[in-house]
Amino acid sequence: MRCIIKRLFQNILTRSKRGSADGGSAEALPPKSLRQFVGGAYKEVGAEFVGYLVDLCGLQPDEAVLDVGCGSGRMALPLTGYLNSEGRYAGFDISQKAIAWCQEHITSAHPNFQFEVSDIYNSLYNPKGKYQSLDFRFPYPDASFDVVFLTSVFTHMFPPDVEHYLDEISRVLKPGGRCLCTYFLLNDESLAHIAEGKSAHNFQHEGPGYRTIHKKRPEEAIGLPETFVRDVYGKFGLAVHEPLHYGSWSGREPRLSFQDIVIATKTAS
């Protein structure tokens, strides 16, 4: 996987340098004003997670991929160097500016990469949103994707919304399709580390079925019980891959990434 990540990162770096030299190619990086909202190092994290999609989810170059909460194309850009002309990418996000940038700079060069705005309410990121998460239906047909992934999305959502999204993920996945989602999972080990002051987030405020770092702005970071997450996956026919890939946020070592990663496969219906 390290070879895949290194190759994808070099592809992004080469394209971004080319964009700076020629006054803005079709694959230049988005402005800092858009990159600041995705968290983490834009190029490095994008290449890192595409490596996970390939290595942990078995993503093939000719498959169809859905990126939920795609932002300004952090995952889409490295995927342009992996998916072939038979492959297909779709992404949606609440940020109109981010989607406009992706359409102008990515879709224009890669027509098999499509982006849509989803006007979903979020108290922090889209307070004027038209739709509630619980009412939002992913704008895609049933069984239309081989892989669905979400990074740093469920870490900002309440349990009922997460459950609804996992239902939608199961709906749009083909039988045998895979999903990758990141979380802050609360279990005996992570809770012990929190109590000992070892974790990056203290999750000291309790809500109904979750914990948060900020009482007045709970969606800033939300931790979910691992038992709840596992139950919901089972409810919607998503078989969790074992072991889970716990992250370093809680003070665990060794770790794969910062957040906890859950991989699952949709069982045949």
Swiss-Prot record:
Keyword Methyltransferase: yes
Leading EC class: transferase
SUPFAM superfamilies assigned to the protein according to its UniProt record, in alphabetical order: S-adenosyl-L-methionine-dependent methyltransferases
Keyword Methyltransferase: yes
An example Gene Ontology molecular-function term: methyltransferase activity
Enzyme Commission number(s): 2.1.1.-
Keyword list, A-Z: Methyltransferase, Transferase
Superkingdom of this protein's organism: Bacteria
Family named by the database record: Belongs to the methyltransferase superfamily.
Protein name: Uncharacterised methyltransferase Rv1498c
Source lineage: Bacteria, Bacillati, Actinomycetota, Actinomycetes, Mycobacteriales
